[in-house]
Each structure stands twice: as C-alpha cells, then as structure tokens.
Amino acid sequence: MNLSRKNCFPFAGIAGVILLNALNLFAAGPKPDGGSGPVQAWVGARVIDGTGKPAIENATLIIRNGRIEAVGRRVKIPAGAERIDATGKTIIPGLICAHGHLSDAAQFGVYLRDGITTILSLGGAKEFDLRDQSAKATPGTAPHVYVAGLIQDSTAIPGAVAVKTPDEARKSVDDLIRNKPDLVKVRVDDFLGARPKMAPDVYQAVIDEAHKNGFRTAAHVVLLDDAKGLLRAGVDYIAHSVRDRDVDDEFIALMKKRHVFYSPTLTRELAVFTYAETPSFFSDPFFLKEADPAEMARMEDPKYQEKMRNDAGAKWYKDHLPIAMRNLKALSDAGIVIAMGTDSGGGPGRFQGYFEHLELEYETKAGLTPMQALVSATGGAAKALNISNQVGTLEKGKQADFVVLSANPLDDIKNTRSIEQVWIGGVRVPAK
C-alpha cells in the first residue's frame, strides 16, 4: 500500500519522522482481497469512475481476484470470464463517508447495504476495537474502517479526552498514538457558549505533537476565526462546515496553501433542527429498510419535537445551514477537495447509511453538480483519507468496491438510492 505523504506536511524539518512513521498512517488499510472466484466481466453498464471524468457509456468492467483489471468501452473480455449483463445499469465506486461515527459492529451492515464501503469514524471510545473487527470480518460483511480514537477536547464528554494545557495535549496525543489512529482529531467549539473552548496554544500542541510523530490531524470547528487559527496551526482536514460567516479569500488561501481537505457535514445541521416535526424522509422506503425503529420513535416523540422547536441551538443551526451551503459551493468553486461526511452516528437522529445519501442531495442543493457530489463521496473522500491508491475510483488495480444502480445519479443525485447490488473487494454484500 502506497502511503505517500505528498501535500500533507510541507515542513522539511519533520520529513525524516514522517518516513519512519509512514506505516502508522491508516494502518488498517483496505482488507485483503476477498474475491477469489472466476473473473467477472460486467458488460453494457454506464460507469461513473469517481474521478470526475464523464461517464463511460456501454462500458465493460473486469474484476479479477477482488481488484479491477480493466474498465472502458473497448475492453477485451478474458476467456472463461463470468459475463454479467449490466445493460441499463449504472456502476459507481463504493461510497466513502469521510466523517461518521461507529459505536457497534452491527452498524457495519447498515453502511454496507446502503453502498458505503469505507468509513472514517472520527471519534469514539470503541473505534480501535471496531477497526480490528472490520479487518478480521468475513469478506463482504464489513466496510473498510479508519478511526481517530478519542477526540482531543477541552471537556471530557463521551468520546473525548480533556486537555487544558499544551503539556496535557502532548501527553494525550502520545497516549493516543500508541494505538495508531488514522487521524488525530481536535475539537475547537464552545457549543454556542455552553462550555469552554480549547485555547490556540493547546490545539497548536495537539497538531504539532501529532505531526512530530507522523500523524495527520482533523478538526471539529464551527466558526471562521477558529478555522483560520487551526489552518495556521497546520491542521490537515477541516471536518465540518464553517457556519457562522461566509468564508473569505484569506480562508481559501490558507486551505490551498497546505492542500487541506474539507468535509461539509450538512446533514449534521439538519439533524439538529429537522426533528421539530416528523421529517418527510421517515416515509422514504430506502430510509425505512435500514432505519432503527426505536430511534425513529424517539425522534417522533411529541416531547422531543417540542424541545427541538424551542431549542435555541437548533434555531441557530437552522439559520446558519444556508451559510454552510454557500461555503461548500465557494470552496468547491475554488478547487478545494471536498470529502463527503455526515457525522452520522454522532448524535440523535443521525441515521447511518441514509444520511450519506441525504448529504449528497444537500450538496447538490448547495450548488454542486451531481458529478461533483459523487466525486466528493468517492475520489475526493479517498484523497482526504490518503487511500486513493486503493479505493475511491474505478480504475485498474484498485479494490473492486462498487455499487450497481438501476438509475443514473447524474440525472438526479437521489438515484444513488436505487441500489441493486453492493460489492466490496470483489465480494457481493449479502442482503439484510
């Protein structure tokens, strides 16, 4: 697995450390190829390869030993290959959630059946165990899992550890990296004045200590000024939208200078306020096939809905969602790599699997084209996770992670929900 660090650390002084610690990065990696059956030839499909290039019409996709051997319109089908007629179907790469949260192995199947074959779980107490379980799982039953472990925070809330001084921050990062996280996450947020916010010298220490040991960093952030401070401190990944103000030229320049990735998590905001009433997607058959009835009941409880109607925080996030959407469009237009993320599983009503598809819908509502939205959940997300040499696009040599759709998502992004089959590493994901 190529663990190139290109554009991650433009600081020559730590180049040797990065080289020595490269194997720490994304240590789990995609699981070994599971497909060992006959060579497959998927014939006649429309292939959207995840690079942003135009769709390949009437394409042939060759799968051998769990990897892509060839894809294109003029592809020779190997002798003895299993020929699969995919006429009228659209094949896309397996989707990548570049910001979600796992808390139980039972959630693996939910993500997979909804076409999410890779997930970055950005903060939680059980994440290292879940990464191990995913790596050891029967082929076709678990996504590729990447994790951050405990979040470096100002307050010890669930899934986080409190660090209040630079020395505490350095020690906490040193403790964390013994488990080889795929990213070190820092949270800079006072939750609309509800608790203290991490000071700049503390998050600087988190980022520096992670970088010194060869680990990249991601940030939970809300406000533009905090996001700029984190960028100046060297953060590698902005894992939420800037929501208080429109981003400016300075912010965009800081993002470009260090090739920082951006995950909008628009549905995170939606989940904060949408349950003031029963949302329309509660009647969507695609949602209902995987939704947890108990969680639905909690969101439909009249007392909970009344609480959401009267919650000042919910109102703030609802009022500021349009800003987040404008910022996504501005950053995409500026050439920043967008990585689809949702914060699914990170709070009440953030339904895993479905919210990834809803996020794509909201990305297009923000002004992205369906192709741009798809790339954010495939090739773009793979770049953000530093795994684009393995997954994210349907190209020769990549893992055979793909989704077969009955309708074209370039016509309507909601067609990503028209899932007929999901494959990971050349193995078909079983139905529920």
Regions found by a protein language model. Give the residues of each.
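Acidic, glycine-enriched loop/beta-strand segments at the rims
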Residues: P30-P32, V47-T60, R73, P322, ...
